[in-house]
C-alpha cells in the first residue's frame, strides 16, 4: 500500500505543526506530528481500520477517518493507494465538512516531497 497526501493535507499538517510549536513548544509539536505519522502508517497494514466519514461519503466515494484528537484524518482507499485528503479539527462545524471541496482530482505527492 502506498500513502499519498493531497496538497491541502500537506498544507494543513504544516499549519498544525506551526500552531502547535507556537502554542505548546517545539517538542510537543514534534511529538504530535510523529503521532499523526504513526497513526497514518498503520493504515498500510489495515487500510479499512478507520470509521466511515458519513458527512462526505456518497454513492461514488467512500471516505474514512482516523481520530488523533482533536483532528480527524480524512482519507480514502482506492486499489493499493491510501490518499490523505485533509485534517479536520473536530470542534469545527460539521456542516462545513459536508460541503468541503475534497480534492478528488487534485495533484498528490508523498508526504514531505513537493
Which functions belong to the PLM regions below?
Residues 22, 26, 45, 49-52, ...:
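Charged, solvent-exposed alpha-helical segments that act as regulatory interaction surfaces
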Residues 41-67:
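A short, surface-exposed loop/turn module that caps and links secondary-structure elements
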Amino acid at each position: 500500500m502506498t500513502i499519498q497526501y493531497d496538497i491541502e493535507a500537506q498544507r494543513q499538517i504544516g499549519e498544525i505543526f506551526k500552531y502547535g510549536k507556537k502554542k505548546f513548544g517545539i517538542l510537543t509539536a514534534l511529538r504530535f506530528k510523529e503521532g499523526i505519522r504513526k497513526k497514518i502508517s498503520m493504515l498500510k497494514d489495515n487500510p479499512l481500520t478507520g470509521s466511515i466519514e458519513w458527512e462526505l461519503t456518497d454513492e461514488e466515494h467512500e471516505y474514512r477517518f482516523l481520530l488523533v484528537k482533536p483532528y480527524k484524518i480524512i482519507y480514502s482507499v482506492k486499489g493499493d493507494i491510501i490518499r490523505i485528503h485533509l485534517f479536520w479539527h473536530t470542534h469545527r462545524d460539521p456542516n462545513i465538512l459536508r460541503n468541503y471541496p475534497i480534492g478528488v482530482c487534485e495533484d498528490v505527492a508523498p508526504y514531505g516531497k513537493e
